[in-house]
Amino acid sequence: MKKYNRIFTIVIDSLGIGGMPDSMEYGDKNVDTLGHIAESVEKFNIPNLEKLGIANLHPIKHVKEANKPLAHYMKMKEASVGKDTMTGHWEMMGLHITKPFQTFTDTGFPQELLDELTKRTGHNIVGNKSSSGTEILDELGEHQMETGDMIVYTSADSVLQICGHEETFGLDELYRCCEIARELTLKDEWKVGRVIARPYLGAKKGEFKRTSNRHDYALKPYGSTALNALKDNGFDVISVGKISDIFDGEGITESNKSKSSVHGMEQTLEIMDRDFKGLCFVNLVDFDALWGHRRNPVGYAEEIEKFDVNLGKVLEKLKEDDLLIITADHGNDPTYVGSDHTREFVPFIAYSPSMKENGLMDTVDSFATIGATIADNFELSMPENTIGKSVLEKLV
């Protein structure tokens, strides 16, 4: 069958489409990120997602089912344990996470780790608890500026996050401290999935805002992924957003950092004008970071509408031998209690101008369907010990 020369995989970070059968085991009852967002607003204008068939896949208030949807679409279950960024993305590319990444949500980090971090960086530490970024800055941002102490905090994810003011603490110093933290947290008892630099600006409480100079220091994937298979066989693997950070650069041939999700789509549109063969892998993080965690369904809805405008431009630029895949890495229902991710199905929406058929496909048991399909398209074998079955033959 016909193979695609370029595949664009866009991850709308946290856009879940309803709780998985095991969601209650994760404390997530009746969650539905996309559905509840639509119910929270008076209108929801996403014509391009609508014509692809998103409302055919999942009922959405204000959005009609398409009579003739353009795309193939289905729900994907998460096979791995967890509901975090790394687990979702790693599974997409073939890895099955059977042991959850260690979290320090309830306990904070061990004093021994904090003492070593202070000793190595020269900065005292405040915080050491689970918190949202906005709350921790309101509480400790002024103190950090006045003292030079580091704000260290975590979340429901396997992360150690360090906040520093861009002007008084300095970006280079923040990155240096995070590199030390990453080295220390490779130790088994302190191991976290990611260390995240969280720079911010502002003069006082209520004015602090995190900047786009965030940097993630992730663990290397424990095995080879579809990205490695592509790169090792001479194909392009162009990342946009935090994809390269999530995989610690493994299997990436070109990395493009984004200032926002809108910027990420603008970068994707520019990449579409280039001649390459392989994968453009995009993560759009604002949905999760700005709206999901902050439990702001109205802001989330507006972000989806902005995405839909740029999606229209993507659809116009797609060539006959291009394939677009739209998906998500987990849920983050902004109407749910708390501030954490939610365990949900995610969408798989696939479209090419050359497709002759369309419609609903059967739910699959793993996000790894994506990586397997991409590898199959380029006639590559997936690395050993990966999961996922290709649906390429159905994308006609």
UniProtKB/Swiss-Prot annotation:
EC category name: isomerase
Cofactor(s) demanded: Mn(2+)
An example molecular function term from Gene Ontology annotations: manganese ion binding
SUPFAM superfamilies xrefs: Alkaline phosphatase-like, DeoB insert domain-like
UniProt-annotated location(s): Cytoplasm
Keyword Transport in annotation: no
GO CC annotation: cytosol
Functional summary from the UniProt entry: Isomerase that catalyzes the conversion of deoxy-ribose 1-phosphate (dRib-1-P) and ribose 1-phosphate (Rib-1-P) to deoxy-ribose 5-phosphate (dRib-5-P) and ribose 5-phosphate (Rib-5-P), respectively.
HAMAP family associated with the record: Phosphopentomut
Name by which UniProt lists this protein: Phosphopentomutase
Species per Swiss-Prot/TrEMBL record: Clostridium botulinum (strain Alaska E43 / Type E3)
Top-level taxonomy: Bacteria, Bacillati, Bacillota, Clostridia, Eubacteriales
Gene for this chain: deoB
